[in-house]
Amino acid sequence: MRETMSRRHFLTTTGIFILVGQAASTVGPSPSWCATAAKVGEPAPDFTAPSTKGTPVGLDAYKGKVVVLEWTNHECPYVRKHYESGNMQALQREATGQGVIWLTLISSAKGEQGFVSAAQADELTTTRKAAPTAVLLDEKGSVGHLYGATNTPHMYVVDKTGMLVYAGAIDDRPTTRRSDVQGANNYVRAALDSVATGQPVKTPVTRAYGCTVKYS
């Protein structure tokens, strides 16, 4: 009897450790370059990256505007959760409808998961009925490193004064289940609401969850 109970305890404990390990792998350790990356409460660093339309887009061009930066990888199951449920598109439309600039960035290196050409990125925007202001291609990962983007999705909010006021996860449900979108605390929406009303962001930093950004 004792042996049976001990075995059950071992299996249960082992299962818990496995589950915890799997959950932890969605965030992972921060790379060394994150130490010098953009920080909440400081001016958002300017950058310029090519859009899928072939024109360079710089953050500086949107002075006086609230800007959302969304790091994405269409093959990542965590990203798919938010697009297949329509959650990301709804948030994009809600934000841009209020004058917010929404820039979607793809930092996957050539040959890595999530890498797409400009035409493929535009096709994804169309088929998923996404509504960003622009999709930017960051093949060399320079913008991603500048902001310390480690996961997809990884979200940032810049206020009208150019300050970085939010960085982290899209919400508090680090799973791939579409059903978990409902009832989740959406940190990005909350940050945008605070900015719109002139209030400080209640939760300015969270730990992003998802697939690691596929840098070269």
For the regions a language model picked out, list residue spans one by one.
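C-terminal segment of N-terminal export signals and the immediately downstream linker at the start
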Residues: 25-43, 47-50
